[in-house]
Amino acid sequence: MAKVLVLYYSMYGHIETMADAVAEGARSVPGTEVTIKRVAETIPADQAAAHGVKLDQKAPVATPDELANYDAIIFGTPTRFGNMAGQMRTFLDQTGGLWMKGALVGKIGSVFASTGTQHGGQETTITSFHSTLLHQGMVIVGVPYSCAGLVNMTEITGGTPYGATTLAGADGSRQPSQNELDIARFQGKHVASLALKIAG
């Protein structure tokens, strides 16, 4: 049995939708147990409501220490200037105790992301996220080109070999496309399959 955690932060719901697709893909692998959780919102509730932040997300809030309970963790974040969102950074900055114990060494780490525009930092968001995972000793997994959606040239679409991505649009009105969700499902299935092999 391999335990997979899909851990995300989503301000307007795009990454939440992608997280559900990632989890769906992971659950398609027999012998895996998949959990979806999110990191806490750090924006004060009144300001979050005033700016249209999606506060009704069903996933429970994770605590840093519980990351050690999983064989693979698939992280999802929107971009902030080519990096992960501050809410995710705040969460990961609380994992020093796990680092001291080597609690995440050898576990799979994978990342998916969203950006406002086609060239808004999808790849840098994921690759900069990898630095934290490498410091924790995690095994990085992306999306191989055996995923057909990565070479889709018929539409504007997210999706990178580093991880699944979606384009939200500058005003957040664009929702994840079928191709982007298919890549997210592929990533979840790919990570879960590898986690099962590692867990033995």
From Swiss-Prot:
The Flavodoxin-like domain, residue ranges: 4-191
Cofactor mode of binding and number, as noted: Binds 1 FMN per monomer.
GO CC term, one of those recorded: membrane
InterPro entries linked to this entry: Flavodoxin/NO_synth, Flavoprotein-like_sf, Flavoprotein_WrbA-like, FMN_Rdtase-like_dom, NQO
Gene Ontology MF terms in the entry: flavin adenine dinucleotide binding; FMN binding; NAD binding; NADH:ubiquinone reductase (non-electrogenic) activity; NADP binding; NADPH dehydrogenase (quinone) activity
Transmembrane segments: none
Residue sites binding NAD(+) per the record: 12
Catalytic reaction list: a quinone + NADH + H(+) = a quinol + NAD(+); a quinone + NADPH + H(+) = a quinol + NADP(+)
EC number: 1.6.5.2
Binding-site positions, FMN: 10-15, 79-81, 114-120, 135
Names of required cofactors: FMN
Keywords: Flavoprotein, FMN, NAD, NADP, Nucleotide-binding, Oxidoreductase
Family named by the database record: Belongs to the WrbA family.
PANTHER family: FLAVODOXIN-RELATED PROTEIN WRBA-RELATED (PTHR30546), FLAVOPROTEIN-LIKE PROTEIN YCP4-RELATED (PTHR30546:SF23)
Name of the featured protein: NAD(P)H dehydrogenase (quinone)
Species in which this protein is naturally found: Paraburkholderia phytofirmans (strain DSM 17436 / LMG 22146 / PsJN)
